[in-house]
């Protein structure tokens, strides 16, 4: 709320109050990534917003990936990153790097950042408490140690939330044999939100949301019924990497999440604008 007059701050808080009251005691899952995670100034503002959400009584869960950090570490050890149809191929050596980077560096950096902004948080991963029951990715391509989340045991998450901490979740998990798998963060966020019957799931991205014209950010679709999604995929309005993200949104809504949003994480305080204002800022997915 930099460079805003006291009068405008009061008006903003007045508008936010009913939304704060609505969300108090509810669970909000935030998939954190993109520029909001890579830009230090944006990162600080997002962590400050997350701390604020927790302070007003919202049960916040942050789910993160860390693809660029994984690639950087692989480069340091002289190992080339391999992608198949845009998805990282994870052999056994890469799986060890993924485990080290996501559950180590990235997760603990986020914990430190959020704690520095006044949040109480705990960094965990899908292996902890056997939170994720994982099996090998079932898509058309063999991606090595890339996993699907078959089940989320919510006991650990509920324990952390009950004790007024914010879980920060790194998206790795293991199967019944103890093999460690790299898990898509969008997938993990959706499964967590579904398992907790969260009030809201928010994907922070590098796009304003769904656009009628992908080259014109002024064509934002502010809300959409999930039954209309297939037509937008067929006519090419939704394409490329946005298709799997949107399908996760559909799954979440169909499995008990009240509202799902795709918002522009490049904009300062986009979380607060989406949650606490009449207009919002991204695309909301809902059903009848």
Swiss-Prot record:
Please tell me whether the keyword Metal-binding is annotated for this protein.
no
A GO term, aspect molecular function: acetylglutamate kinase activity
Catalytic reactions of this protein: N-acetyl-L-glutamate + ATP = N-acetyl-L-glutamyl 5-phosphate + ADP
Q: Name one Pfam family in it.
A: AA_kinase
Q: Which family does it belong to?
A: Belongs to the acetylglutamate kinase family. ArgB subfamily.
The site feature described as Transition state stabilizer is recorded at: 31, 245
| SUPFAM superfamilies xrefs | Carbamate kinase-like (SSF53633)
Q: What does this protein do?
A: Catalyzes the ATP-dependent phosphorylation of N-acetyl-L-glutamate.
Q: What is its main location?
A: cytoplasm
HAMAP family linked: ArgB
Q: What InterPro entries does the record tag this protein with?
A: AceGlu_kinase-like_sf, AcgluKinase_fam, ArgB, Asp/Glu/Uridylate_kinase, Glu/AcGlu_kinase, NAGK-C
List the GO cellular component terms: cytoplasm
The UniProt record lists the keyword Magnesium: no
Binding of substrate, residues: 66-67, 88, 182
- Enzyme Commission number(s) of this protein: 2.7.2.8
The organism that produces this protein has a lineage beginning with: Bacteria, Pseudomonadati, Spirochaetota, Spirochaetia, Brachyspirales
Q: Pathway it acts in?
A: Amino-acid biosynthesis; L-arginine biosynthesis; N(2)-acetyl-L-ornithine from L-glutamate: step 2/4
Any single GO BP term: L-arginine biosynthetic process
**Class of this enzyme:** transferase
Q: Which residues form a coiled coil?
A: none
Subcellular locations according to the entry: Cytoplasm
Its protein name is Acetylglutamate kinase
